[in-house]
């Protein structure tokens, strides 16, 4: 399948070297056009999304299946037919889908639109420009993309809830209790902690070094300092092992489903009024660091967020708790 798609980009034969540039361009375009009839849109989407990370792959495939379900797209059409569509009109139609047709939120519509644009960009490159790139609207009253909320939806625990959650989690699973503390202190994503290797830990300095990949290219190294008491528990847990820090009984890396289950269970046992997910711990870390008076730049050095806007989005402290509450200027 992959080789079939790549055949769209076959090199031109040397027999055309005597022709003019315009003649060669025309021949090449005709060659692409004929080959495009051999590929269905469904085949192309499956091939393309397989090269993306799991989350994006699942999201994009779901988007196109949803677009077909409401009649905005047919995955059975070939690439010739797809190239003749007015992609900008389809983007507009995605944003104007009525609630009577589907219960998409504004955020869902924007995800669907982003998926569609990404597909046209991929095919534009594969077909040497025959498939046009869908252009998002930037008009004030009909923007394709805009921020739907000031802060993220994820809840955050207060200090008492955090202590209660950790207490209950330790009863359920001591290893997952260590995982939760690793995430909290560093404001880390679950994937960053679950993939952690023992070689990244320095027990003498009580630090753990995390690597973040930005756009799959630029590596960002973040060093988090942990309390000595925690490092003692962690060292006892690891013993003489090598490899991943947190492992199952069979020595494999702990999965996301495992901690999602135990975190949720601990939250219930601690009587926390919202579901505790791994991402709640990241929001909790940002909120707690802000409450303790840390600057945005200091928190960014811990969490790895690229901008202060993201820190603001994760900060769940009251918007009334600002400088005007602490001092009067008049």
Swiss-Prot record:
GO MF annotations in UniProt: DNA binding
**Active-site residues (renumbered):** 189, 214, 279, 282, 305, 314
Keywords, alphabetical: DNA integration, DNA recombination, DNA-binding, Plasmid, Viral genome integration, Virus entry into host cell
Gene3D superfamilies according to UniProt? Intergrase catalytic core
- State a single Pfam family of this protein: Phage_integrase
Q: Does the keyword Amino-acid biosynthesis apply?
A: no
**Organism superkingdom:** Bacteria
Q: Name one GO biological process term.
A: establishment of integrated proviral latency
Q: Where is the Tyr recombinase domain?
A: 152-327
Does this UniProt record's set of keywords contain DNA-binding? yes
- Regions crossing the membrane: none
Start and end residues of each Core-binding (CB) domain: 39-124
Misc. remarks from the entry: pGP8-D is required for growth within mammalian cells.
What does the sequence similarity comment in the record state about its family? Belongs to the 'phage' integrase family.
The protein depicted here goes by the name Virulence plasmid integrase pGP8-D
Which organism encodes this protein? Answer: Chlamydia trachomatis serovar L2 (strain ATCC VR-902B / DSM 19102 / 434/Bu)
């Amino acid at each position: 399948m992959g080789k079939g798609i790549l055949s769209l980009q076959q090199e031109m034969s040397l027999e055309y070297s005597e022709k003019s540039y315009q003649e060669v361009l025309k021949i090449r375009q005709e060659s692409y056009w004929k080959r495009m009839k051999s590929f269905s849109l469904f085949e192309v989407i499956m091939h393309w999304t397989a090269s993306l990370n799991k989350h994006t792959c699942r999201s994009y495939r779901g988007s196109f299946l949803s677009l077909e379900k409401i009649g905005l797209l047919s995955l059975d059409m070939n690439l010739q037919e797809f190239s003749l569509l007015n992609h900008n009109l389809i983007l507009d139609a995605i944003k104007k889908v009525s609630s009577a047709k589907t219960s998409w939120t504004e955020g869902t519509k924007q995800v669907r639109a982003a998926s569609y644009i990404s597909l046209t960009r991929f095919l534009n490159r594969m077909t040497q420009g025959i498939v046009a790139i869908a252009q998002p609207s930037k008009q004030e009253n009909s923007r394709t993309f805009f921020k739907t909320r000031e802060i993220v939806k994820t809840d955050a625990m207060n200090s008492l809830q955090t202590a209660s959650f950790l207490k209950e989690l330790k009863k359920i699973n001591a290893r997952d209790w260590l995982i939760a503390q690793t995430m909290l202190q560093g404001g880390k994503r679950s994937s960053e902690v679950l993939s952690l290797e023992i070689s990244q830990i320095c027990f003498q300095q009580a630090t753990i070094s995390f690597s973040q990949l930005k756009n799959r290219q630029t590596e960002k190294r973040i060093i988090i300092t942990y309390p000595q008491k925690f490092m003692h528990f962690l060292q006892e847990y690891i013993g003489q092992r090598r490899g991943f820090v947190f492992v199952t009984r069979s020595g494999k890396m702990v999965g996301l489903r495992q901690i999602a289950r135990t975190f949720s269970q601990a939250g219930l046992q601690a009587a926390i009024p919202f579901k505790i997910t791994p991402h709640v711990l990241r929001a909790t870390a940002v909120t707690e660091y802000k409450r303790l008076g840390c600057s945005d730049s200091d928190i960014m050095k811990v969490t790895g967020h690229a901008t202060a806007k993201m820190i603001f989005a994760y900060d769940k402290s009251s918007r009334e708790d600002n400088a005007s509450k602490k001092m009067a200027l008049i």
